[in-house]
Amino acid sequence: KEFRYRTDSRGNVIRHVTVDVISPIAVPGRTFYTVRIPYHADFERFYAEARAIVTDIPQDGDPYGAEKVLQAQGDYDVFLLSATPDLYFTSLTYAQGAPGQPTEYPLMNAGKAVMREGRLVMPLSIFVNHAFVDGAHISRFFKLVEECLKRISA
């Protein structure tokens, strides 16, 4: 639940029931296009909708459209998941928001998956607001991610 806390446009702390994913997707012939993928408790439904969204990116759309909608509504009920599939890392510091454009939601980056000692490993970095999330929460989050990845890869 700690990853669902945000500060609203009036400075009040709120907790979202669910949060969606925004993710920049590489687009051939262009750099990227950011999509918003709605939360679904059922992974199969989430995956099907995510796949449909990612494969139906408009050719003439604004690559920053999802972020602009978030800024306009002033409600950051999302987390960002970016991928760097060609980069295996042991540490990554996220680009921080510019003055007047604070980072209002968790930022995550998934790196290149590689084989290590017979196991597939994938780096994952996260940037959060420490007012809401501490080390124990992050540890619990990573444990849940590991359990989910084991379950879907079995």
Which residues does each PLM region occupy?
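Flexible, Gly/Pro-enriched loop and linker segments at secondary-structure and domain junctions
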Residues: 77-119
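Conserved glycine-centered short motifs in functionally critical loops
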Residues: 112-118, 122-126, 134-136
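Helical lid/core segments from catalytic subdomains that handle acyl or acyl-like groups
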Residues: 27-89
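A structural signal for short, well-ordered beta-strand segments
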Residues: 21-23, 108, 124-126
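C-terminal functional regions of eukaryotic proteins
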Residues: 13, 106, 133, 138-152
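Charged, conformationally dynamic linker/hinge segments
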Residues: 101, 116-120, 146-154
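Hydrophobic "lid/gating" helix adjacent to the active-site nucleophile
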Residues: 1-21
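Anion-recognition interface
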Residues: 130
